[in-house]
């Protein structure tokens, strides 16, 4: 449990669903904290605080899908930049990187990040980030986040980790040195097959400002209904993950 601070307007311990697009101003240009729900919504904000707390980050962001979250993170880079990725990343991630973002001049290389020497050999002069997925979907290949993050910092690179399969219940990449964490919240975080969502968490105010600018500009935000459903799902995350873990151990 995290992010449970009560609704600021009413004191409700369960965040209300603010199904609203615009907000009344106190005066012309004087807002009460929100102006337009693409930019910010109280229900979505509560979810963003929640995931940031769970991951131990500075700020969280909620998107309309995991791919919306990943794509928005990739929009932090520019034409001519290079990103190194785990070779067994989720198929949707591979597709958007290799078939869509490549059209905008963002280069990529996919390697087995489980071996640091592969990463070292694939780094280029224009490399800006290392994107890890660990364990991977679907082959469950594992990468040492701490070792890669340490190397990335030495090279001045960002470390991005897809934490979908482990969730913050079992793994907190920021504590291991990562700069950005991304989730397809559709899976374990939501847990009930009733919401499609993506989440991201960053470890600095600078990255928070940059990613919020992209989130607001592109507009692939999570709606208040889905934000509320996801918060409700996360309340049972610990119980569910323990059961998943026990079942997996029995099968193994």
Regions found by a protein language model. Give the residues of each.
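Active-site donor-binding loop signature of nucleotide-sugar glycosyltransferases
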Residues: 2, 21, 113
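Short, basic and Ser/Thr-rich N-terminal targeting/leader segments
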Residues: 12-13, 45, 56, 104
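Conserved PLP-enzyme active-site core in the AAT-like
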Residues: 61-252
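Conserved N-terminal alpha-helix of the aminotransferase class I/II PLP-enzyme fold
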Residues: 22-71, 76, 92-99
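A generic secondary-structure signal marking the coil-to-beta-strand transition
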Residues: 13-17, 32, 59, 226
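Short conserved active-site loop signatures built around small residues
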Residues: 1-17
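Short Gly/Pro-enriched turn/cap motifs at secondary-structure boundaries
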Residues: 7-10, 40, 189
């Amino acid at each position: 449990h995290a992010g449970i601070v009560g609704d600021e307007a009413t004191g409700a311990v369960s965040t209300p669903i603010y199904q609203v697009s615009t907000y009344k101003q106190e005066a012309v240009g004087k807002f009460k904290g929100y102006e337009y729900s693409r930019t910010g919504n109280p229900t979505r904000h509560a979810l963003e605080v929640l995931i940031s707390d769970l991951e131990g980050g500075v700020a969280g962001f909620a998107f309309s899908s995991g791919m919306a979250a990943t794509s928005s993170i990739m929009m932090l880079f520019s034409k001519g930049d290079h990103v190194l990725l785990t070779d067994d990343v989720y198929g949707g991630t591979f597709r958007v990187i290799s078939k869509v973002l490549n059209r905008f001049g963002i280069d990529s290389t996919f390697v087995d990040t489980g071996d640091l020497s592969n990463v070292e050999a694939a780094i280029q002069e224009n490399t800006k980030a290392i994107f890890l997925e660990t364990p991977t979907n679907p082959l469950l290949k594992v990468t040492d986040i701490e070792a890669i993050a340490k190397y990335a910092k030495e090279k001045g690179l960002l470390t991005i980790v897809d934490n979908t399969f482990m969730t913050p219940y079992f793994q907190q990449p920021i504590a291991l040195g990562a700069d950005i964490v991304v989730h397809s919240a559709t899976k374990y975080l939501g847990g009930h097959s009733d919401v499609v969502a993506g989440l991201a968490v960053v470890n600095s105010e600078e990255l928070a400002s940059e990613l919020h600018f992209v989130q607001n500009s592109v507009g692939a935000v999570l709606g208040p209904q889905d934000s509320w459903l996801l918060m409700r799902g996360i309340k049972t995350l610990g119980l569910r993950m323990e059961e998943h873990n026990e079942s997996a151990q029995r099968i193994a």
